């Protein structure tokens, strides 16, 4: 999509962003037409103008901010029809770098560089090598949804985000195939900023370490029980009661060990999925 088509793309983005909002659960804070107060303050400062509420932002200011801080940031002029709009919309909602990371993930295995959110020579070269931008858009939107589902704010804004990405997918694919895109609709929650700072924490392996002894001490609960079992075993022949205790201790040790190993597998699997969603997993 060329620069002259920036305005149609912006019109679709603004439909998704809506007007002024100040939802306490939205990490973006006070926002108008997708421009946060923080971004607006930075823009006004750069112009040598006094701060004012983002409620007072003009459409000329909106257009300039989107053009410079989002469209140019993702190098919209250098991307194919449809793909540029999809990356542009993602950049507005989650930051240009994050949206470029989704593009880089979607370009695998053609793209072999780091998932760093930089639209460099390698990313652009891989993009030019793609012969099915329709499918590429699907992969970008899939990566975006995977990221969104790993945010702690998804229960609050997930319905709106899901609706927005579904429309972005359809609009982008229409542009990619030369068809007339559908209108974009505002769905409450879809305008909330989706930021990596709100990502869920990876599950801790501490419970598994405590159970199996894989932590710093090297001796977990199952290890202590195993030692106790060894100490009591010689006495089990002299007392039926001690023999029963040995059996119980042995069973408890086995349950803790198996449970700890199972939880560690679960925690590592969740951590891997989180890393993939956030773009931090090794290539």
Report each predicted region and the residues it spans.
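Cell-wall polysaccharide-cleaving catalytic domain and substrate-binding groove, primarily
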Residues: 1-254, 259-283
């Amino acid at each position: 999509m060329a620069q002259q088509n920036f305005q149609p793309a912006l019109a679709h983005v603004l439909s998704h962003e809506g007007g002024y909002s100040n939802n306490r659960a939205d990490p973006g804070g006070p926002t108008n037409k997708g421009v946060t107060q923080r971004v607006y303050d930075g823009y006004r400062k750069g112009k040598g103008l006094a701060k004012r509420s983002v409620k007072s932002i003009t459409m000329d200011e909106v257009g300039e901010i989107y053009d410079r801080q989002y469209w140019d940031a993702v190098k919209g002029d250098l991307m194919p029809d449809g793909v540029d709009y999809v990356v542009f919309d993602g950049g507005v909602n989650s930051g240009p770098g994050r949206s470029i990371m989704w593009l880089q993930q979607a370009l695998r295995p053609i793209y072999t560089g780091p998932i760093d959110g930089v639209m460099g020579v390698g990313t652009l070269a891989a993009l030019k090598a793609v012969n099915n931008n329709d499918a590429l858009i699907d992969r970008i939107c899939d990566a975006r949804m995977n990221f969104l589902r790993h945010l702690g704010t998804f229960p609050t804004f997930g319905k709106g985000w899901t609706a927005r990405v579904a429309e972005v997918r359809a609009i982008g694919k229409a542009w990619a195939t030369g068809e007339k895109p559908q209108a974009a609709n505002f769905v409450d929650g879809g305008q909330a900023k989706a930021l990596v700072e709100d990502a869920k924490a990876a599950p801790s392996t501490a419970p598994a370490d405590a159970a199996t002894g894989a932590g710093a001490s090297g001796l977990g609960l199952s290890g202590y029980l195993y030692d106790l079992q060894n100490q009591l075993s010689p006495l089990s022949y002299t007392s039926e009661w001690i023999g029963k205790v040995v059996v119980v201790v042995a069973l408890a040790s086995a349950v803790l060990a198996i449970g700890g190993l199972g939880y560690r597998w679960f925690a590592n699997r969740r951590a891997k999925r989180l890393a993939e969603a956030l773009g931090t997993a090794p290539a």
